[in-house]
Amino acid sequence: MKFPWLLLVKGAASVAAQKPLATSGSGQVLGTFNLEDIINASPLLSFHRDIVKIPSTTDNEYEVGQFIGDFLEQKHFTVEKQSISDSRFNVYAYQGNNSLPDILVTSHIDTVPPFLPYNLDYPILGGGHEFDRQSVLIAGRGTVDAKGSVAAQIFAVLEILEEKPDASIGLLFVVGEEKGGIGMETFSKNPSPSSFHTVIFGEPTGLNLVSGHKGVIGFNIKATGRAAHSGYPWLGKNAISALLPVASFTERLGEIPFQDGGLPSSLKYGNSTVNLGVIQGGVAVNVVPDSAEAIFSVRVAAGTPDESKSIITREVNKFTKNDPNIEVAFYPGGLSPTDLDTDVEGFDIITVNYGTDVPKLAIHGGGDRVVKRYLYGPGSILVAHGEDEALTVGDLEGAVQGYRVLIEKALSRDV
């Protein structure tokens, strides 16, 4: 039996064959055809629209969590709302009493700020171009990262459960991925042995299967100076001036060969990359600044976080000649590169530079049991977090099929 929403999608595709004449200022109407008709005709696209329209920047996920939980309950899932705080919770859903599923399908429901409203558009490609429904562009914060994955995962699971009602699949949608990963860490605190033999993570991968991603560490460099009147700067010591050279040097550590003192690289992930994301200091333009700080994020291509921390500390001290007024401090934790499974045919394989919740999901017990971990999803990371975040109808619908392939492979696994 086919899902009714698949029939609606086919109906929308036939209607969409009309040739567009023009686009309005809102980007919503093409000649006599309204792009919203395509969205309204598809339960998948409508659900995606509904959750994207709900602002859910990190720490403000309550409303979208409620919406997703209610939707899954209407689809006869048992839904647990795992509390993070009074106004934040993970959504964990499964069939009946099967709270320990074999397969876990997961993504995150928080987004980075600022909220950007949902919008539809269509690229006009010139005369004679036939309307292509799959090229309709869906824009807004979270369309890609990661509400595209959330929607596609849910509808892929619904399709499979329609065909195989006894399939042992759970859905987990966590908060806080964009800021520290508290949602996945909270889910992982359950000390009971993990039941799942396969976990499918959703992030924007361009419909490619990811073989791994870099690790990450964060740190700051602080400079201490001496305040003075700006008219007599020689009476003080400018902390910003002291900080800038070492900050610039540190930013280049990923480009320096490892044997020459740089950060590690690997054939799989390439160079480690260093981002100088924040620099701050001083209190007023007429005061010599007595303090300054530079904050860095490193995407680590090889080795452990501690190894990279040692390199950074050593090279900063060497560059500053052990200046006691320049200090390096690392933020707690850090992650090594994460390798993932790619043993499913039909996908292109890539690596990515961004971090995910994958290493934050703890696997408890099980002895030598191998848990497969896959990372896949619609949309490009190159537009995620930006003002032009968007994906196409084709991306979203293609992801449903991709998730189906991954889940079907997991269901056939002999464990």
From Swiss-Prot:
UniProt family annotation: Belongs to the peptidase M20A family.
Cellular component, GO, one term: extracellular region
Glycan-linked positions: N97, N271
InterPro entries: ArgE/DapE_CS (IPR001261), Bact_exopeptidase_dim_dom (IPR036264), Peptidase_M20 (IPR002933), Peptidase_M20_dimer (IPR011650), Peptidase_M20A (IPR050072)
UniProt source species: Aspergillus clavatus (strain ATCC 1007 / CBS 513.65 / DSM 816 / NCTC 3887 / NRRL 1 / QM 1276 / 107)
A Pfam family the protein falls into: Peptidase_M20
Protein name as annotated: Probable carboxypeptidase ACLA_013260
Source superkingdom: Eukaryota
Cofactor note: Binds 2 Zn(2+) ions per subunit.
Positions contributing to Zn(2+) 1 binding: D145, E178
